[in-house]
């Protein structure tokens, strides 16, 4: 378990897990923001497409690099019923991260839509060796120009240290200041920034 101290995290290497429509869009955006961006998918063809179309570096082993951030974009509904949640892929990914991640204190951000209680299950699998946030996407394939990756969104963190890590990542640009707004509104419980983020501590 992490010893919670004042966070001063540096994010460089980001791994996007799940390279479908959402994951590929997220990977492209993360790369555009200046991060060293990698991708993983159980479908090797998806990794090849991400590499060819966007230069996303494919990986099979989460321990092959010392990743600072794991962004989970795997599907969370049954293949034949989009209204029935299925979190096996999320938990399998979390288990793989738990077994293979080299860096204690890295950030795990779940961007997939998940049912209540899922973040807590992921957090327990990781035993707070890594920070966990839920930053549900608002990306819409049919209107990507208006509803792309960079939108105001809500972030929930299991602990305050998780929220701080999530906020730092989602407002980091690796020096590309033109890619985000500078203004950040802070209150005792709510933080607003871009890619953009409205952050509330909660335990799901």
Describe the residue ranges of each PLM region.
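NAD(P)+-binding Rossmann beta1-loop-alpha1 motif at the extreme N-terminus of oxidoreductases
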Residues: 2-60
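Internal alpha-helical scaffold of NAD(P)-dependent oxidoreductase catalytic cores
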Residues: 2-6, 100, 125-133, 139-204
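Short, glycine/charged-enriched secondary-structure capping and boundary segments
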Residues: 29-32, 52-55, 84-88, 122-126, ...
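Short, charged/polar "capping" segments at the starts of alpha-helices
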Residues: 44-49, 116-118, 161-165
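A short, aliphatic-rich alpha-helical micro-motif
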Residues: 62-67
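N-terminal Rossmann-like NAD(P) cofactor-binding module of classical short-chain dehydrogenase/reductase
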Residues: 70-71
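Conserved NAD(P)H cofactor-binding loop of Rossmann-fold oxidoreductase domains
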Residues: 74-75
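Rossmann-like NAD(P)(H) cofactor-binding subdomain of soluble oxidoreductases
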Residues: 78-143
């Amino acid at each position: 378990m992490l010893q919670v101290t004042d966070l001063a995290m540096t994010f460089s290497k980001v791994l996007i897990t799940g390279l479908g429509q959402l994951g590929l869009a997220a990977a492209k955006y993360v790369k555009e923001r200046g991060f060293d961006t990698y991708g993983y998918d159980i479908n090797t063809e998806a990794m090849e497409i991400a590499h060819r179309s966007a230069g996303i570096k494919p990986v099979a082993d989460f321990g092959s690099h010392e990743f600072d951030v794991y962004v989970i974009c795997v599907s969370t509904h049954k293949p034949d019923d989009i209204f029935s949640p299925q979190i096996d892929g999320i938990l399998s990914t979390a288990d793989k991260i738990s077994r293979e991640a080299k860096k204690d204190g890295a950030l795990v951000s779940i961007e997939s839509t998940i049912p209540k209680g899922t973040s807590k299950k992921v957090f327990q699998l990781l035993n707070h060796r890594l920070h966990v946030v839920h930053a549900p996407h608002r990306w819409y394939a049919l209107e990507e120009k208006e509803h792309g990756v960079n939108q105001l969104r809500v972030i929930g963190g299991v602990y305050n240290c998780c929220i701080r890590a999530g906020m730092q990542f989602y407002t980091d640009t690796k020096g590309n200041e033109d890619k985000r707004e500078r203004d950040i509104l802070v209150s005792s419980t709510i933080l607003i920034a871009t890619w953009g983020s409205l952050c509330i501590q909660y335990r799901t």
